[in-house]
Amino acid sequence: MARYVFITGGVVSSLGKGIAAAALAALLQARGYRVRIRKLDPYLNVDPGTMSPYQHGEVFVTDDGAETDLDLGHYERFTGRPANQQDNITTGRIYRNIIEKERRGDYLGATVQVIPHVTDEIKNFVLEGNEDYDFVLCEIGGTVGDIEAMPFLEAIRQLGNELPRGTAVYIHLTLMPYIPAAGELKTKPTQHSVKELRSIGIAPDILLVRADREIPESERRKLSLFCNVRESAVIQALDVATIYDVPIAYHKEGLDSEVLSAFGIDPAPKPRMDRWEEVSHRLHNPEGEVTIAVVGKYTGLKDAYKSLIEALHHGGLANKVKVNLDWIEAEVFESEDPAPYLEKVHGILVPGGFGERGAEGKILAAKFARERKVPYFGICFGMQMACIEAARNLVGIEDASSSEFDPTREPVVGLMTEWLKGNMLEKRAAAGDLGGTMRLGAYEAVLKPDSKIAQIYGSTDIHERHRHRYEVNIDYKDRLEAAGLNFAGMSPDGVLPETVEYADHPWFIGVQYHPELKSRPFEPHPLFASFIEAAIEQSRLV
């Protein structure tokens, strides 16, 4: 039977509950246990698919097409286990499910209430499908005290009573701020956060305390006394250089041992930390460095590109180099010459995005990379802009544009209205809802055997994750290829372009999908590993 770990957060948001959950899962995996992680998000959106990147950060897409919280990306990268639709739930989905049941008459005329109907729906989500796992870690989004989180906290309180004794453990992540004027760390915010949690009926078994400096033993004893947890269960979570140092740091502090002790598992299998130690060693002992320009449109919030950032660092791990990121807002190039920004970098990456803002700047970045022979990696929107650039400047189609921006006469990029998903034909209307109406999830692509990208993958058949409504128009394929832009990858039915590249360029590849979503520190995505390798070659020329 699965054991459950519920992870809550207090004092402030953005403390790193997702990283903590992922790190603990990795530590339990290192001991040979089978682990699943689930995220419970209190917001009323059905999913984050229509939320602004500035509000929510990245939307992480799973193989089965779920648009989920970015924390699921951490879960995948730390554990290697692909997430799915059933690993993320929101208040919006909970209420939608309940309303659908009420309309069908499933409640037999009962008054539908938060307790028991909403809490029961949450509990069903937590408990469903866990037969093959030893541990299920559930991260509760938000902060203790948030109104939106109350039904979720009540649900996990009930589960603590309903599950067999010894199969549920509560971890509370808090902040211990340092006050320079007093010259000391303060325990009071954590005390109040635990008091709030206990008033709900949840007594934390373990405190995971974030701090920017060593927590004195006297302060640990104070937290133990006033928060009613064992002193050994007050675990300090100090700031570290990279997120991949977290599992090692938490293991040294005894987090995994304390969790197993709370479950009464003694003795426990010894952990194998060698691969985490190897990743940490490579990160802290690079044999060189490269600089990659990321020409984006949400650069004000780096969380909007979380998986992309990590995938670039994975590419650095594969090549034993440090990857420095130079963030450039694409709109800058609409009024300034790109050359001063780009001529010293070793590679240019244009990531995905939506809408017209910044599009011309991304087109100019692609033009600079093509003409100057700088390694270029265009992802989703970045591939589309590279095709528009080629259509304008190589084919001579001056009005080449995307129908996403305006009803252009030359829609090199246009709205997809239908595509194959397996043996099923999926259709979308231009006037339909935004939520869940994109080409989402893993799709197959067929690569030309003699293409550069096929050599990088070592295969002509690939499966990658997509998230887009617009696609390069197949009607322009022949003219673009005649100008030198090779359509190296297509959907199996030959209708949807998946990858493009220039044969006469050291490294210029555009992909319609999002390879960053499948990159792992232990298995860097081949495209990112190859891109960083090309950047290393470029660094010798600059």
Swiss-Prot record:
Biological or metabolic pathway of the protein: Pyrimidine metabolism; CTP biosynthesis via de novo pathway; CTP from UDP: step 2/2
Catalytic activity as recorded in UniProt: UTP + L-glutamine + ATP + H2O = CTP + L-glutamate + ADP + phosphate + 2 H(+); L-glutamine + H2O = L-glutamate + NH4(+); UTP + NH4(+) + ATP = CTP + ADP + phosphate + 2 H(+)
Binding locations of L-glutamine: Y54, G353, F381, G382, M383, Q384, E404, R469
Class of enzymatic activity (EC top level): ligase
UniProt: UTP binding residues: S13, K186, T187, K188, P189, T190, Q191, K222
UniProt-annotated binding residues for Mg(2+): D71, E139
One of the record's GO cellular component terms: cytosol
Domain Glutamine amidotransferase type-1: 291-541
Pfam family, one: GATase
Binding, ATP: S14, L15, G16, K17, G18, I19, D71
Activity regulation: Allosterically activated by GTP, when glutamine is the substrate; GTP has no effect on the reaction when ammonia is the substrate. The allosteric effector GTP functions by stabilizing the protein conformation that binds the tetrahedral intermediate(s) formed during glutamine hydrolysis. Inhibited by the product CTP, via allosteric rather than competitive inhibition.
GO molecular function, one term: metal ion binding
Listed EC numbers: 6.3.4.2
Top-rank taxon, per record: Bacteria
Region feature (Amidoligase domain): 1-265
Miscellaneous comment text of the record: CTPSs have evolved a hybrid strategy for distinguishing between UTP and CTP. The overlapping regions of the product feedback inhibitory and substrate sites recognize a common feature in both compounds, the triphosphate moiety. To differentiate isosteric substrate and product pyrimidine rings, an additional pocket far from the expected kinase/ligase catalytic site, specifically recognizes the cytosine and ribose portions of the product inhibitor.
Family according to the record: Belongs to the CTP synthase family.
Protein's name in the database: CTP synthase
Organism: Brucella melitensis biotype 1 (strain ATCC 23456 / CCUG 17765 / NCTC 10094 / 16M)
